[in-house]
Amino acid sequence: MLKRLWMIFGPVLIASLLVFLLIFFYPAEMRHDLGAEKRSAVATTIESFKERSQKVRALSDPNMRFVPFFGSSEWLRFDGAHPAVLAEKYNRSYRPYLLGQRGAASLNQYFGMQQMLPQLENKQVVYVISPQWFSKNGYEPAAFQQYFNGDQLTSFLEHQSGDQASQYAATRLLQQFPNVAMKDLVQKLASKEELSTADNEMIELLARFNERQASFFGQFSVRGYFKYDKHVAKYLKTLPDQFSYQAIEDVVKADAEKNTSNNDLGMENYFYNTQIKKDLNKLKDSQKNFTYLKSPEYNDLQLVLTQFSKSKVNPIFIIPPVNKKWMDYAGLREDMYQQTVQKIRYQLESQGFTNIADFSKDGGEAFFMKDTIHLGWLGWLAFDKAVDPFLSNPTPAPTYHLNERFFSKDWATYDGDVKEFQ
């Protein structure tokens, strides 16, 4: 009987063991290929966002300075003034590595950072903070889970230090992913229990396996590889060879005029046709009761700030506006939006994060927005005027003064004068 079982299952077990050994002992390092790295940097796929190998390879390239651009879906709004296009056209000293997806916010970004901590150390980054992230209940667990994987989990468990940030991250992970792998270890962290030697040995073993698995399968990744032509290359020939903001503005303004011709809301024609037009009447005053002042996202943002402080990262934060015509039509309250911006800025500035490009009042400028909430055309140009000088003249991170009160529910639900928060 045992012999028959071995004849059936033995080959499967041997094959599984060989695959495990192949992956476990596969080299974690990948050879640099600038062309491939440029393509993965602008792929804006779920894979390029949440997987380790492609972003680590690019961010560790000694011959090209790729800079993490953290955000959500704004990176997908390509045109002639998009930061990836301008950096390539004018051969700047850096290239953006675009990290974001629709529905992603600070919690996903934090866990993604755990995969590339050595590549963040003492570096500059760009971080877009969209006030729309700060909804009452935060974002849906399904959205979080879509951008989370086992490598992020073991990277987090390996690097956590048992501090308040680690405890909070573990608690949020259980909320967003109740059936997460290694749940017992995550629960220990959330409960402030110390991990045992056996726990740490298992984490280290699985972390090495996940890292090598990412390297092994990353070499076969082609998803998004051919998007470079659509996202970047097609715009290069439309821009003037000699850099000039005025000349670039003339080009992208003409493009914007052509592509916002079918609506009175200043939105790109395609977006208006596919996302707004059919429901236009229903959308009137649909956001009049929205508030972004009370949200767990404020605590999630503190996770990111804590990581930046630990890694001595020098970030510039971008706060985008809402399309003013859309804001008025949908009934979104301007005073609430600006109060949200002030709350975000207070959390940043009071802890020493003072590099902020605040465009929150520019949503009424012509051709500033691509759609309802995303920058485009002249908005990207304004973005570039703030970001390019920052990245082209690197400086070390300042000294930060973290305040753990920003992890509290009191702060997450506070809607008063920020200067009076105790």
Question: How does the language model describe each region?
Answer:
Residues 4-26:
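Hydrophobic membrane-insertion alpha-helices, especially the h-region
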Residues 30-94, 111-113:
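Membrane/wall-proximal cationic-aromatic binding patches
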Residues 35-36, 156-300, 403-422:
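Secreted/periplasmic serine-hydrolase-like ester/acetyl group-modifying domain
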Residues 64-66, 94, 121-124, 310-315, ...:
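Loop/turn elements at helix/coil->beta-strand transitions in domains of secreted/extracellular proteins
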Residues 71-72, 128-132, 270-279, 318-323, ...:
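Short loop/turn segments at strand-loop or loop-helix junctions that form parts
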Residues 75-165:
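Membrane-embedded segments
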Residues 88, 293-299, 304-367:
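Extended hydrophobic/aromatic segments used for targeting, binding, or gating
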Residues 99-101, 336, 342-422:
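C-terminal regions of proteins
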